[in-house]
Amino acid sequence: MIKVTIPANYLLALQHLAPKKEVRYYLNGVAIIAKSGKISLVATDGKVMGCLSKTDYEGKDFSCILSNETLKSLSIFKGKEVDFVLHDGADGFVLKGIANGLVFDAIDGKFPDFERVLHGYNHAYNGQAAQLDIELLSKFTSVAKTLGNTKFAGNWRLLHNGASNSVGVYKSDATETGEWVWYGVIMPLRA
């Protein structure tokens, strides 16, 4: 049995970075990945990626992807601090919150190796500026607002790494408690 508690607004925030109708169907949602004592919530559309993770997970390793449809049913909790418990049941995964459990089948597919793409805070960035798509950057503002960080939603630290490498997108106060750590990247515009 898998049991992990996840704030609803974290899943809804990351949904802003997930595509709506991607041919690579396994990207159409938010991945929950537990590996080696760390649990990560990840979403990407191939141009932007965001991850909230924490390192005090003590359960078994697992991976599942919540579809956009499943996340849509959680939207009634937007703006509320509601924790859900994820169980691996006989009928699929079950999210249990204040209401009855939402039973869903995880998307059948393997989420890309996001750790290969995300840079840690200590990564050596070269500082060379890159041109960025303002619409893609605005997705991070939507993420911050959904996380409840409305006052400084547009304040993100961009760590440039040249015109052909991903740019780190960081916000040290992305979550109120600091229990979950934010990592993000955005790809620069191609000339």
Task: Give residue spans per PLM region.
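DNA polymerase processivity clamps
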Residues: 1-191
